[in-house]
Amino acid sequence: MLDHPSDGLAAIRTHISAIFGSLELSRSAWLVTSLSPGKGEKMSRHSVTAGDVAGLMKLFADLGRKAKARTGESYPIITIQEAGLDGFWLHRVLQQEGVESHVVDPASIAMPRRSRRAKTDRLDGETLLRALLAYKRGEPRVCAMVVAPSPEEEDRRRICRERG
């Protein structure tokens, strides 16, 4: 017999100890999906002009200020983006700015196999963010993070791809 009878299923709460963001990069815009402490489990979406690193860092600073106003605490920024044609330059810049940046192999993210799924940047951003949260919780086989090559190695790879 239970000491405290349950009225139903309990919600699973996740303690958010950082500002998490996924980056969907395109030629014209970067879509940022974020989850911040003190907002419950509501994800926010923001757009930054492609290549505008200063605008991206301003967005992260704004998210940090808002989270601090809600909770009274400062939080690190943790991001995820898919490995792709853009290379690893943004990953390196984010790390230099003090952001914990992760690059994921897009083929490694678990997806439902039986059903067809809509493909939109909004859904991709949410999927990436959920994968990052699961990865940071230590869940096994969630996704495979890519080790960023050195700039020199990346240049060598690019030359080989352009010749091929």
Residue ranges and their predicted role:
Residues V53-I78:
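Short, basic/hydrophobic alpha-helical segments
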Residues M1-R13:
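Charged, flexible boundary elements
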Residues R27-G55:
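Short glycine-rich, Thr/Ser-proximal phosphate-binding strand/loop in the N-terminal lobe
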Residues I77-W89:
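Acidic, metal-coordinating catalytic cores used for nucleic-acid/nucleotide bond scission
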Residues R27, L85, S108:
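Short, glycine/acidic-enriched loop or turn micro-motifs at the edges of active sites
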